[in-house]
């Protein structure tokens, strides 16, 4: 067992994390926000990479909301090499698009969110290919978790293995009561490899996460809500998109808020959850400081004084 770090070393690590977060906050400030704006797109336009992943930038009253729709029906939306490549490309573009305010990940295949890794494709891999493939899944899911804007997983169907790990990488999860969710890898004599062993305990607690992973238990929407795995559960509608509609409602609630503040708030929460309270409060202070000099903060105060809705520009 490694020796415990000295108090001074822990202090240095905490101070280093605060400085790192402060630097990240600074990059999210007005100067960075003003750069790299994406060209205006038409109503609910579609960026056609391939049909397996549809990227829609919503418009009009939904401007700023982006929907990633997984559309791989023949593979139950399983994570293939090609789908991972498209997800990676889409996420890479979205993280630097300052017009993006909230991202929703959903399925466009009825009854399925994502069935996990493509096991048929994996069965054809040489043993030397499996490790890098799982590493790619983990990397793409990590990239989703690290997106600077709020992310919502709309689970209207089956979310197993890597599919649930994909949802766990999102800030908020909503599901239909008929949805099925579980980390079932132990049934295949493996373990969750896309972050599930780390994110599930952080979402629902260590003991319950162990129970679910050890048993490979599958939960429905009501059960998932009861253990805190999802934030909202809805009765499925005739169209089969109840979770997506709820996700869209939540995303609309986020739109009026200050864009820089939203990004900095997410950074403060995410980083603060990984450290002790004292360090977390220092991270909050560093993040708050980045909002003070923004034009949006002044606009918020002026709008309050004038009793009107604020007109934030992300500056």
UniProtKB/Swiss-Prot annotation:
Modification N6-succinyllysine, positions: 76, 85, 89, 120, 124, 136, 180, 187, 305
Protein name in UniProt: Methylglutaconyl-CoA hydratase, mitochondrial
Natural source organism: Rattus norvegicus
Pfam family, one: ECH_1
Gene name as annotated: Auh
Span of the transit peptide along the chain: 1-43
Enzyme Commission numbers on file: 4.2.1.18, 4.2.1.56
Positions where N6-acetyllysine occurs in the chain: 76, 89, 120, 180, 187
Keywords: Acetylation, Branched-chain amino acid catabolism, Lyase, Mitochondrion, RNA-binding, Transit peptide
